[in-house]
Amino acid sequence: VGLTFDTGALIGLERSRHLMRKVYDVAVSHDVRITVPSVVIAEWWRAGEQEKARAKILRSVVVEPVSELIARLAGVALTLNPRAQTIDALVMASASLRPNEVIYTSDPNDLEMLRDCVPQFNSVRIERA
């Protein structure tokens, strides 16, 4: 099992929300891989007083670049669900390449709609951050 964090999950972790702090602490203590697609960082990262805390979080996760395969899977998802957001499609595509992956998100409904319309995404579990 591995975890993928989207922007909402990172915000929850940064703000020390109980659920995300617990998920993160358990994952780190059990050497569970936490993946953050690189596009999520662009949506989450802001300059300012929290940069050191954000950098510390980033050092503890695997930042995954968007490969051509991920981009194509996301494009298929956007074809099948034109109302979906590009970053959500990229997060789902990224997670779908790892078996037994769980995505933590603040928008489970958006990701569930993508999962339901793209067969390659069916194995991804989605949890509220």
Predicted segments with their positions:
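Acidic, PIN/NYN-like endoribonuclease modules and their adjacent C-terminal/linker elements
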Residues: 2, 97-129
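Short beta-strand scaffold positions
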Residues: 36, 65, 86, 105-106
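Acidic catalytic patch
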Residues: 40, 61-81
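Alpha-helix capping/helix-boundary segments
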Residues: 9-10, 40, 70, 90-91, ...
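Acidic, metal-associated active-site segment
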Residues: 44, 85-102, 110
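Short, well-structured N-terminal submotif of metal-dependent ribonuclease cores
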Residues: 1-36, 45-61, 127-129
